[in-house]
UniProtKB/Swiss-Prot annotation:
Role summary: Involved in siroheme-dependent heme b biosynthesis. Catalyzes the conversion of Fe-coproporphyrin III into heme by the oxidative decarboxylation of two propionate side chains.
Top EC class, one word: oxidoreductase
Record-linked NCBIfam families: rSAM_ahbD_hemeb, rSAM_more_4Fe4S
Organism of this sequence: Methanosarcina barkeri (strain Fusaro / DSM 804)
Protein name, as recorded: AdoMet-dependent heme synthase
Pfam families: Fer4_12 (PF13353), Radical_SAM (PF04055), SPASM (PF13186)
Cofactor: [4Fe-4S] cluster
UniProt-listed Enzyme Commission number(s): 1.3.98.6
Entry binding sites for [4Fe-4S] cluster: 19, 23, 26
Domain Radical SAM core intervals: 5-214
Length: 349
């Protein structure tokens, strides 16, 4: 049965595909060259109007590097005035006191800053630029002095797997309000050979569950739908009932929100379930966003757990996990196939 269509909770919007770095794991394979045909300022404002007419989601201004787009502050202010909660994802290297104050004036409520290693060697290797780590830390220091809330995002891969605990400690030392881990999906420049093994994937998520119990900052696993299965398995073992009081926001949501509570909009207006799943839902230059969100075939299928195939289709956790549809697509060409990086066997007690 297809679930009733709700307004999106989050929209990740690639304001520009241009970037000042050359990250090895970049979803969009962004470069310093800005592609032709990106949405104009007027088109961006029209899109915000459309979004605000159907709900008030969190609007994530992303890239590329969104701070390379000259009208980023104008667009952010417009989103804020439309009643959206505007946040911005950055690599942190371009942050200055002046830019931070402009972001504050535009109503941006939080920044996410990417740190992919606990030291310069690992982080710079990810970012494709010597000195990126120090520049990012300098940007974070600007945020700290300005008392501007920020979270740290880390993409987990073989390159930094054994540094995750140290990177988490670094995030706390830097004063982050949250630490989000993303698990590499082989899209764009993301290389399949850099993906962690299914066993390591499971191990890190179990560690994450234990850290959530005692952490004073928010922890969130993204592109890791298995976490919601693990959370329930562990809570059952511990005799804990999952609730907002015990598990916070995670008690109210599910693993993969792609197409159900989340979507990705590219710099040229293309709409996808997420930035890692290249199955086109529509283009906001060609049809209203509401129409795409409510009627796109890929979204309708993703909203129906009965469409899932393989072991995901028979799994008792499919309504809270659903597997990573982008990984299924990368491995098989079918986004409804079973999640290739899950070691769980459905029905196992």
């Amino acid at each position: 049965m297809i679930a009733m269509t709700n307004a999106p909770r989050l929209i990740a919007w690639e304001l520009t595909a241009g970037c000042n770095l050359n990250c090895v794991h970049c979803r969009g394979a962004s470069t310093s060259s800005v592609p032709a045909g990106e949405l104009t300022t007027d088109e961006a404002k029209h899109f915000i109007d459309e979004v605000a007419s159907i709900g008030k989601p969190i609007l994530i201004l992303s890239g590329g590097e969104p701070l390379t787009r000259p009208d980023v502050f104008e667009i952010a202010r417009y989103g804020t005035d439309a009643g959206l909660r505007v946040v911005l994802a950055t690599n942190g290297t371009l942050l200055t006191p002046e830019i931070v104050e402009k972001l504050r004036a535009a109503g941006v409520q939080r920044l996410s800053v990417s740190i992919d290693g606990a030291n310069a060697e690992t982080h710079d290797n990810f970012r494709g630029m010597p000195g990126a780590f120090e520049r990012t830390l300098a940007g974070i220091e600007v945020l700290r002095k300005a008392d501007f809330p920020f979270q740290i995002n880390t993409t987990v891969s073989k390159r930094n797997l054994e540094e995750i605990t140290k990177t988490f400690e670094l995030a706390k030392e830097l004063g982050a309000v949250a630490y989000h881990v993303f698990f590499l999906v082989p899209t764009g420049r993301g290389d399949e050979s850099d993906e962690v093994s299914p066993a390591d994937y499971e191990r890190i998520l179990h560690w994450f569950y234990e850290m959530q119990k005692e952490s004073k900052i928010q922890l969130k696993a993204t592109c890791a739908p298995h976490y919601f299965r693990i959370m329930r398995q562990q809570a059952k073992k511990e005799g804990i009932e999952i609730s907002v009081k015990t598990h916070g926001y995670e008690a109210m949501t599910k693993g993969c929100l792609g197409g159900t509570g989340f979507c990705f909009v590219s710099s040229v207006g293309k709409v996808f379930p997420c930035g890692y799943l290249p199955v086109l839902a529509g283009n906001i230059r060609e049809q209203p966003f509401r129409e795409i969100w409510e009627n796109a075939e890929v979204f309708r299928k993703l909203r129906d757990p009965e469409e899932l195939k393989g072991k995901c289709g028979i799994c008792e956790y499919k309504k809270v996990c659903a597997g990573c549809r982008a990984r299924a697509y990368a491995a098989t060409g079918d986004y409804l196939e079973e999640e290739p990086y899950c070691i769980y066997r459905p029905g196992k007690k």
